[in-house]
C-alpha cells in the first residue's frame, strides 16, 4: 500500500507550475487496495485531480495501470510519475516547450532522476552514483548516437497521439519503460533528455533493493526476447547502432550481472586450489587474458564512479565509488533471482517498499544537477 505516500504525493503535485485548467492528474489505484482507497477519499476534491481504480486481475503491473489511466485521458501530453516522486515544479512547462522545439520526430522527453535521500547509507550512495552516471553520461550519449533509449519508469513526457499509435505500454512487461523506448525507436521516433530533475526515494534496504533490481533485470530479458523474435525485421528497423544498444544495454546488463559472481568464483578457485580440472578447462592464457579484463574493467568502473562523484560535486560519494565491487555482489544476487523468476513468474510485479527514508521529502526540487 502507498497510503503513507498519498497525501505527500498530492502535495508535491500541487507544486507543479502549470495552468490548473489544463491539468488532468489521475491517481492510479488497485481496485482491491482498500486501505489506499480509503486514504484517497480523505483528499481534498480538486477539479484537476481524479482517481482511476484499476481492475484487480492479471497482470497486476504498473503498465496495465498506466494503460487504464491513459484510456480516460484527453490531453495532448502524457506524463508518468511514481508515488514517491518530487518533480521540479517547472518540469511540465519545460517538457511542453522542449517538445515544441524538438518537433514531430520526437515522441518523448525523459527528465533526469535523482534522490532526496542519497546520503542515508552506503546503498543509497551507490544508487546515487548508479543513477548519476546513467542520466548524466550514458543516456545523453545514447541520444547523441541516435541509439534506442531504454526509458526510465517515471518522469517521461509523451506525445499522447504517438503513444496511442504505438500501442502504449505492454501490460505484461515488468520494465515497460525500456520496452516502450525500443518500440518508439523502431517506429521511427526519437527521445530527448529534459534538463529537469525529478527526485525520488533511493532504496535504502538491501533486500528491498534486490527485489527492485531483479524486476528490472527480468524485464530487460523479457524486452530483449520480445524484440529479438524477428531478427531481420528488428535489424532493419533499429540499424546497427540500435542492435548494439539492444544487445549491450538490454541483454548485456542482466547477463553480465549474472555471470559476474560465476567468474569471480572461478578466479578465486584458480588462484587458491590449482585444480588440474580447472587448468584443463581453462588454460593459463585464458586466465591471464581474464585477469587483464578484470583489472582494466574494474579500474574503468571505479574511475567512472569517481568521475560521476566529481561531476555531481558530491565528495561524500567517493568512498562509495571505491567500494563499488560490493555493489556488484548485490547485482549478482538480483540477476540470479531475475533468472529464476523469468521462468517461474515472468510477469509478477514485485513491488518496492517506499517510505523507508529518514529525510523529509522536498516539496520543490529544481532543475539542474542530479543529486
Task: List the predicted regions and their residue ranges.
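Short, well-formed alpha-helical segments that are part of the catalytic scaffolds
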Residues: 2-15, 35
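Acidic donor-binding segment of Leloir-type glycosyltransferases
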Residues: 14-57, 100
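Long helical/loop segments within the catalytic core of UDP-sugar-dependent glycosyltransferases
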Residues: 42-76, 89-174, 214-225
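The conserved acidic donor/metal-binding loop of glycosyltransferases
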Residues: 82-86, 172, 184
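Catalytic core of nucleotide-sugar-dependent glycosyltransferases
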Residues: 129-136, 211-231, 296-304, 337-339
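Acidic donor-binding loop at a coil-to-helix junction in glycosyltransferase catalytic cores
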Residues: 174-180
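Catalytic donor-sugar/metal-binding loop of nucleotide-sugar-dependent glycosyltransferases
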Residues: 181-199
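Membrane-embedded multi-pass helical conduit in multi-pass membrane proteins
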Residues: 245-343
Amino acid at each position: 500500500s502507498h497510503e503513507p505516500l498519498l497525501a505527500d504525493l498530492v502535495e508535491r503535485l500541487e507544486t507543479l507550475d502549470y495552468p490548473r485548467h489544463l491539468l488532468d492528474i489521475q491517481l492510479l489505484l488497485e481496485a482491491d487496495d482498500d486501505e489506499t482507497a480509503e486514504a484517497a477519499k480523505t483528499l481534498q476534491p480538486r477539479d484537476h485531480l481524479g482517481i482511476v481504480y484499476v481492475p484487480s486481475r492479471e497482470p497486476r503491473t504498473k503498465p496495465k495501470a498506466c494503460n487504464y489511466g491513459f484510456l480516460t485521458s484527453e490531453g495532448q501530453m502524457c506524463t508518468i510519475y511514481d508515488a514517491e516522486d518530487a518533480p521540479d515544479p517547472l518540469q511540465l512547462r519545460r517538457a511542453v516547450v522542449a517538445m515544441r522545439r524538438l518537433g514531430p520526430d520526437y515522441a518523448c522527453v525523459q527528465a533526469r532522476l535523482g534522490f532526496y535521500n542519497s546520503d542515508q547509507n552506503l546503498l543509497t550512495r551507490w544508487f546515487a552514483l548508479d543513477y548519476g552516471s546513467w542520466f548524466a553520461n550514458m543516456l545523453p550519449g545514447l541520444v547523441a548516437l541516435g541509439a534506442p533509449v531504454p526509458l526510465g519508469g517515471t518522469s517521461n513526457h509523451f506525445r499522447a497521439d504517438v503513444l496511442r499509435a504505438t500501442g502504449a505500454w505492454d501490460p505484461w512487461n515488468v520494465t515497460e519503460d525500456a520496452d516502450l523506448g525500443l518500440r518508439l525507436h523502431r517506429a521511427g521516433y526519437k527521445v530527448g533528455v529534459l534538463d529537469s530533475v525529478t527526485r525520488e526515494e533511493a532504496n535504502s534496504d538491501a533486500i528491498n533493493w534486490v527485489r527492485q533490481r531483479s524486476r528490472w533485470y527480468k524485464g530487460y530479458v523479457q524486452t530483449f526476447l520480445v524484440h529479438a523474435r524477428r531478427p531481420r525485421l528488428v535489424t532493419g528497423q533499429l540499424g546497427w547502432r540500435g542492435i548494439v544498444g539492444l544487445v549491450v544495454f538490454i541483454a548485456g546488463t542482466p547477463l553480465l550481472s549474472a555471470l559476474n559472481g560465476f567468474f569471480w568464483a572461478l578466479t578465486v578457485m584458480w588462484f587458491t586450489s590449482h585444480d588440474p580440472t580447472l587448468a584443463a578447462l581453462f588454460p593459463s592464457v585464458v586466465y591471464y587474458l581474464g585477469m587483464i579484463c578484470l583489472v582494466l574493467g574494474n579500474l574503468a568502473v571505479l574511475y567512472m564512479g569517481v568521475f560521476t562523484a566529481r561531476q555531481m560535486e558530491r565528495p561524500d560519494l567517493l568512498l562509495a565509488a571505491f567500494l563499488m565491487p560490493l555493489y556488484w555482489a548485490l547485482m549478482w544476487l538480483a540477476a540470479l533471482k531475475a533468472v529464476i523468476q523469468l521462468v517461474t513468474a515472468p510477469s509478477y510485479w514485485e513491488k518496492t517498499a517506499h517510505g523507508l527514508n529518514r529525510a523529509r521529502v522536498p516539496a520543490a526540487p529544481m532543475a539542474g544537477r542530479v543529486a
